[in-house]
């Protein structure tokens, strides 16, 4: 066996070993999210991943990153096949999200060509900034993006979650990656940049990590009411599976929610202390209650029994033959005012609308070919309800996956929303981790904007969340259930709410600038290397 063969085999073995470690890191990062929920694994998992790529040559770094990304994304979104009925979209979405990781590692590695960027703090800063920028970009593009899987989200249960009001997921993401790089540098077996410093360099890095991790606990997350309390009832009527068949039977889903509402109305938690409003899930009314009088009468029966308005969800077709996904407030005895409705702003690509329909329908499933696109709404994500004492209470609203989009929920808060309400329909996902992951996203929104938040699901999980992100009350999945709780209403605006898209926008611009400069450095080095080669050859 020749020397070159030995080197090739050693290199292959090295790549395989690194890939196994990267897979472990990806699975560990997945485990920091629901349904596992070991949030404390986020930083170690990323540190382990960084240890495999920060000194690797480009081919190995790309391979390792691909393995890490797929090991993370595939189990995280294993609920996709439950919703679409087939596995290819699951792997395609995981692949697309992994490519964002691969893009990040290219530019992150290139920054290490700058001599000043090789120290622990400089590397941590550049890796953190660019990861946060790429994360912000993939959460917004293509189409509406996919905000799932941000490494900030498990921090709702960690001290780093206390940073949410001061920079949202963008800031927390950057801090998580920053700490992960420092952990990697502090515990690396060989690190020339650290070894050149004093003997205490590694302990100092460890102290910095520990201090930075616990320091946010000094930041208080307020919970007190600024405009009194609102007593809410959450109605989870449940849907018989398969859900499509349940929706095909007129009134079945509506009656499930009516039945649960009547049980709530007669329960001690409501008879002793009446609610101000009941919250039903997305699609909780299976027909347009204005077009189907019997459906409207059923909803009114529930509202009358509760002696409170009900926030309902339903769909209909508009004049352009497009689906509209509505939230509306139904007042007992008087019905609903169409002028105060909200329709979903961010339909889910390939789920609620088909991009490039003419092309895709030619080879898509029969359902995709026959389905109608959902049209995005234009109404402000803010609805006003009347409390029992006569107060007008503005609520920031979103529908289902819109809990993942600060652009929607943040807009509602900036417009004066004093609490956040997100009706959801999770029957597609059954008892998978999707609903808990969505609840985690809503917990982050509550912390970012210092608002109480409620997820009212048709099938679970439903959550009542405090302004600092902890869960006040919750339900299980695939069951009929109700909740009643008092939530504090708040009016002050956090920095995250006031800044809006400016924080992630600035980080994305900074990331783009770094990527351009790093690319220019690589090109410049290539040009200089070619010139030296020509001189050496005498040409």
Regions found by a protein language model. Name each.
Residues 2-220, 431, 442-446, 457-462, ...:
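Membrane-embedded alpha-helical bundles of multi-pass enzymes
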Residues 91, 151, 235, 342, ...:
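Hydrophobic residues at beta-strand termini and immediately following loops
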Residues 33-48, 72-77, 236-237, 272-287, ...:
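Short, conserved active-site loops that position catalytic residues or coordinate cofactors/metal ions
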């Amino acid at each position: 066996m020749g020397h070159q063969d030995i080197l090739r085999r050693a290199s292959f073995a090295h790549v395989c070993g690194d890939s196994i470690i990267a897979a472990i890191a990806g699975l560990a990062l997945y485990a920091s999210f629901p349904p596992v929920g070991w949030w404390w694994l986020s930083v170690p998992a990323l540190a382990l991943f960084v240890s495999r790529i920060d000194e690797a040559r480009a081919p190995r770094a790309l391979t390792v990153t691909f393995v890490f990304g797929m090991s993370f994304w595939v189990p995280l979104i294993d609920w996709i096949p439950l919703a679409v009925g087939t596995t290819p979209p699951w792997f395609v979405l995981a692949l697309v999200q992994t490519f964002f990781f691969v893009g990040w590692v290219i530019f992150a590695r290139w920054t290490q060509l700058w001599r000043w960027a090789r120290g622990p703090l400089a590397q941590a800063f550049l890796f953190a900034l660019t990861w946060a920028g790429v994360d912000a970009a993939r959460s917004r593009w293509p189409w509406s993006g996919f905000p799932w899987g941000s490494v900030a989200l498990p921090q709702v249960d960690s001290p780093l979650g206390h940073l949410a009001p001061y920079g949202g997921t963008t800031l927390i993401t950057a801090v998580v990656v920053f700490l992960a790089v420092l952990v990697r540098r502090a515990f690396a077996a060989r690190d020339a940049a650290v070894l050149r410093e004093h003997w205490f360099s590694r302990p100092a890095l460890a102290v910095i990590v520990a201090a930075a991790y616990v320091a946010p606990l000094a930041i208080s997350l307020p919970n007190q009411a600024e405009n009194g309390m609102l007593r809410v009832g959450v109605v989870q009527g449940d849907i018989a599976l398969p859900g499509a068949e349940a929706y095909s039977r007129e009134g079945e889903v509506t009656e499930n929610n009516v039945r649960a509402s009547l049980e709530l109305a007669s329960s001690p938690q409501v008879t002793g202390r009446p609610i101000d409003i009941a919250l039903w899930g997305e699609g909780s009314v299976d027909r347009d209650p204005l077009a189907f009088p019997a459906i409207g009468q059923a909803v009114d029966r529930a509202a009358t029994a509760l002696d409170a308005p009900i926030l309902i969800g339903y769909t209909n077709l508009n004049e352009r033959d497009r689906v509209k996904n509505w939230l509306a407030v139904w007042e007992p005895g008087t019905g609903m005012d169409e002028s105060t409705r909200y329709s979903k702003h961010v339909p889910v690509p390939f789920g609620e609308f088909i991009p490039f329909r003419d092309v895709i329908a030619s080879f898509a499933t029969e359902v995709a070919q026959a389905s109608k696109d959902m049209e995005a709404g234009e109404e402000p994500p803010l609805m006003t309800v009347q409390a029992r004492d006569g107060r007008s209470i503005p609520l920031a609203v979103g529908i289902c996956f819109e809990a993942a989009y600060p652009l929607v929920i943040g807009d509602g808060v900036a417009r004066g929303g004093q609490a956040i309400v997100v009706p959801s329909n999770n029957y597609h996902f059954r008892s998978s981790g999707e609903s808990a992951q969505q609840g985690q996203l809503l917990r982050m929104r509550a912390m970012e904007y210092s608002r109480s938040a409620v997820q009212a699901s048709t099938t679970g999980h439903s959550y009542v969340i405090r302004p600092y992100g902890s869960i006040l009350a919750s339900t299980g999945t695939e069951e009929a259930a109700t909740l009643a709780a008092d939530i504090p209403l708040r009016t002050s605006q956090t920095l995250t709410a006031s800044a809006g898209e400016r924080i992630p926008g600035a980080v994305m611009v900074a990331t783009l600038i770094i990527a351009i400069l790093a690319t220019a450095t690589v090109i410049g080095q290539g040009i200089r290397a070619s010139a030296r080669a020509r001189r050496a050859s005498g040409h």
